[in-house]
Amino acid sequence: MKVLVTGATGFIGRQIVSHLNDAGFEVRIASRRPVRPERADDVVQLPGIDAPADAFLAMMDGVTHVVHCAALNNDHGASEADYMAVNGVLTGRLAHAAAARASGRFLYLSSIRAVVGSDFSGAIDEATVPAPQDAYGRSKRDGEIRTLDAYRSAGRSDAAVLRLPPVHGEGMKGNLATLMRLADSALPLPTAALTGTRSLISASAVAAAVLRLLTKPTPLRPIYLAGDRRPAAISEIIAAFRRGFGRPPRRVAVPAAPMRMAATLFGKGRAWQALTATQICDPSLLASEGWVPETDTLEQLAELARRNHSRAAQAR
């Protein structure tokens, strides 16, 4: 049984390929730069957005399932149209081809940004009304709609969207990578003012969720939400990274009000709101179908920093 995986060279995709191989699946990689990664059985060119339909259909020959995790993210030079083309239109074209040619399931890896902005505070589940606040979130929501519509129009119900909170692991980018760099500082940090709490998930746990959704015996639901068992405070995340770097906590009890005023003054008010927002994902639906949320979030973050520190020391 063969699974087509897009985005397989990314830090999440690599874990998915590894988990699929360990479970006995053959893996076909679709990539814009078709170089065979470890443990892939074959590699094909990922067609461009304007490629003919036959190019997308050809990718699906011999494929049972499709896992689409390729995406445009954290690209400050990209326009709204760029995000929409890659995360929306291309996703829709893949889904239409898979609905026509692949016999199994289609999983689209999405993000909680498809439903809430970075400054949203509250609980998030599958029923959360989508209100994306940035180009990335709007494009991921568009990809969700196109995926489910493609399968619905083909009379099929074996496609699902898997929404993810921030994902950690080797090669991560975005806010978690920024926090890890910030934690690797000898200076005291005003973490007492960073009152936000976040649900996180590891790349390995994402891969385990993908494997479960591909193999579970019952039909797919259209939307799933993943996340670790326990959310982590921003201050705990930074402390875990510092522990991994071998640095003392060195937290400074700066009140939140002056920090908020300074952030607003320098045009960083939205970023400050994100650091103080609480976003808690409820993965109970996915857990009820056999996936097990991880419980050692902070230990994994510390180990991630420890490995980064070790590599940096060896490179010196």
Over which residues does each language-model region extend?
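Conserved C-terminal active-site "lid" loop/helix of NAD(P)H-dependent oxidoreductases
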Residues: A203, A239, M261-P293, E303
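Mid/C-terminal beta-alpha module of Rossmann-like enzyme folds, strongest
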Residues: R212-A271, A302-R316
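Substrate-positioning beta->alpha
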Residues: M172-T178, A192-L214, R221-L225
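NAD(P)H-binding glycine-rich loop region in Rossmannoid oxidoreductase-like domains
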Residues: P47-R93, A97
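N-terminal Rossmann NAD(P)H-binding glycine-rich loop of SDR-like oxidoreductase domains
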Residues: V3-A23
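Conserved Rossmann-fold NAD(P)-dependent oxidoreductase catalytic core, especially the SDR/UDP-sugar
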Residues: R93-A135
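Short alpha-helix in the Rossmann-fold core of NAD(P)-dependent oxidoreductases
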Residues: M84-T91, L107, S139-K140, S199
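Catalytic helix-loop patch of NAD(P)-dependent Rossmann-fold dehydrogenases
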Residues: A85, F120-V167
